[in-house]
Amino acid sequence: MNKFNLVTKYAPAGDQPQAIQSLVNGINTGLQHQVLLGVTGSGKTYTMANVIQQTQKPCLILAHNKTLAAQLYSEFKQYFPDNAVEYFVSYYDYYQPEAYIAASDTYIEKDSSVNEHIEQMRLSATKAILERNDVIIVATVSAIYGLGDPEQYMQMLLHLKVGEELGLKKAQTKLVEMQYSRNDMDFSRGSFRVRGEVLDIFPADSEKDAIRVEFFDDEIEAISVIDSLTSKKLKSLHRATIFPSTHYVASKERKEIVIEDIKKELKERVKYFEKEGKLLEAQRIEQRTKYDIEMIQELGYCTGIENYSRLLSGRAPGYPPPTLIDYLPENALVIVDESHVTLPQFGGMYKGDLSRKSNLVNYGFRLPSALDNRPLKFNEFESLLPQTIYVSATPANYELEKSQNTVQQVIRPTGLLDPEVFVRPVAIQVEDALSEINKAIAKEERVLITTLTKKMVENLTEYLSEHGVNVRYLHSDIDTVERVQIIHDLRHGVFDVLVGINLLREGLDMPEVGVLLIFDADKEGFLRSEKSLIQTIGRVARNQNGRAILYADVVTKSMQKAMDETLRRRKLQDEYNQKHNIVPKTIIKNIDDMLDSSPEMQKRAYKNNLRLKVDDVDVSAILGMTEATKVIKALEKRMRAYAKELEFEKATTIRDKITEVKQKFINL
């Protein structure tokens, strides 16, 4: 059994040792709910990593957005390089859900763009949690959305073993049932190809490695891992397990039962509409559902098969759908990061989904069973949680009331104090901001500015730019990858000032930022509540010179509470430093490591590395004419690129490789 192995140069310090010990004791004594109340920059992620190391429990970490999830994923990848650290977020780059607007009689068909790399990582996550114990999955709200049933999923595995009697034809049939497609021309994820008695499978959960199975009659003679692009053999295996290409799979027998269940439900629904005099709806549901049934019979799936997920899993009406949480073993640990934001987000998903789906059901676009393809209700989510740790600098009343053990982590290992807080009048906020920015730039510090509206973000950015400030803005219209890149560029000093609204709060790690400016701090509300202000002020707590300036004409209750709490923590930290002779020092994490190990950036790096594999292609590993043609095209593309870059020696080497492939396979 694989064990978690925490790799780090640092020992726990500050409040970390007592926090780790208290949380571990709580887990070992069976406490269900604990809270880690840790100030910004106190090393909460490192504390989590130590708890996982000491308890040796598989762990699901929940975050409230992709940016924070990517940061957590990259940090845990560094802490546990020898273990399975996985990433489970929405795989849609673009998503327009199916909907019907009754007022205008408008049906909007589902339209989406799936990110294949993220889809592969989701499949990799469920595979890892089913195969091994040393697994950490970092997930967003996607964790509570319907997924294929784990029991059905496990029944559809293809087990391969050297010396086993299986047969090439039987293996292909099984792969098709698992939603793999045969493609001898374009060997890509979720497909297989056959050359003589050699079967190559590109597992849907694999990023670049494929499995080669060699048969002798019906017996498996050899199994090996190959590079999917070059076909170069990487290592031999005695056995291998292939997981389905999608989470929504079922056996042939189960599909036959499902089809009968769909027909039965359709009959009842048509009867209901006809009785109500809704003949258009009756015709619509019959036509659409019969088409889906035909697709399932012919291909094994249909567009929108997730709407039949309750029938596929055999669950009763109203039962919670299977989700990622169902894939977790009983001894798993759940950590909810930034719980004061994450839990309300999870709680709000069900009702929004229900109102949209109800229209589809009421007007004959979907059967009533589609209502059970949904996110979990909050009480269902609560009931499914194993032992849980809520992590936040500002936990909400819900977590504090649930908690059987609340652990405070106020002292930072770095000795850093909470920032100084100043209040200045609103009338001078723009001019004063410009003055503070110039002072910060002179000290090579970065500046964050938070405002209340998108319009103000853009106007302020334009104003600062006109006054010679190198500035960028960040708001909800900017996609995940660009957001990560913007934060990376700020830390690198590509620009000096970042303006935003609510995207500068939880979890973002930017120790280079020394000044925070909060515009209109006295406007009571969601973005200027006590907890929001504490979180926002925390963005400059990782810098030894960190200071926050609140622009306000009156000091609101929220402002006063936030300033009092910041001062309380600052005094405790200062006393600890004096007692232990600690001098506060900014700790700068490696910027490129954090960026490069995020999933979106890994995808870019993988594409850049493909050309290196093409250059290194093993001619002896090429199977047949089709693959040879594909390799020649890739090599010719690289040759032209090298020639364009005036790298003629490399271009000549590639030309010789092309000649070698042609001589072997095409005889030219």
From Swiss-Prot:
Gene3D superfamilies: 6.10.140.240, P-loop containing nucleotide triphosphate hydrolases (3.40.50.300), UVR domain (4.10.860.10). Forms a heterotetramer with UvrA during the search for lesions. Interacts with UvrC in an incision complex. GO terms for biological process: nucleotide-excision repair; SOS response. One of its GO terms (molecular function) is excinuclease ABC activity. Keywords: ATP-binding, Cytoplasm, DNA damage, DNA excision, DNA repair, Excision nuclease, Nucleotide-binding, SOS response. SUPFAM superfamilies: C-terminal UvrC-binding domain of UvrB, P-loop containing nucleoside triphosphate hydrolases. Residues 429-595 form the Helicase C-terminal domain. One of its GO terms (cellular component) is cytoplasm. The gene is uvrB. The beta-hairpin motif is involved in DNA binding. A motif (Beta-hairpin) lies at residues 91-114. Its main location: cytoplasm. It is found in: Cytoplasm. This is UvrABC system protein B. The UvrABC repair system catalyzes the recognition and processing of DNA lesions. A damage recognition complex composed of 2 UvrA and 2 UvrB subunits scans DNA for abnormalities. Upon binding of the UvrA(2)B(2) complex to a putative damaged site, the DNA wraps around one UvrB monomer. DNA wrap is dependent on ATP binding by UvrB and probably causes local melting of the DNA helix, facilitating insertion of UvrB beta-hairpin between the DNA strands. Then UvrB probes one DNA strand for the presence of a lesion. Coiled coil: none annotated. The keyword Magnesium does not apply. InterPro entries: Helicase/UvrB_N, Helicase_ATP-bd, Helicase_C-like, P-loop_NTPase, UVR_dom, UVR_dom_sf, UvrB, UvrB_inter. It comes from Francisella tularensis subsp. tularensis (strain SCHU S4 / Schu 4). ATP binds at residues 38-45. Residues 629-664 form the UVR domain. It holds the Pfam family ResIII.
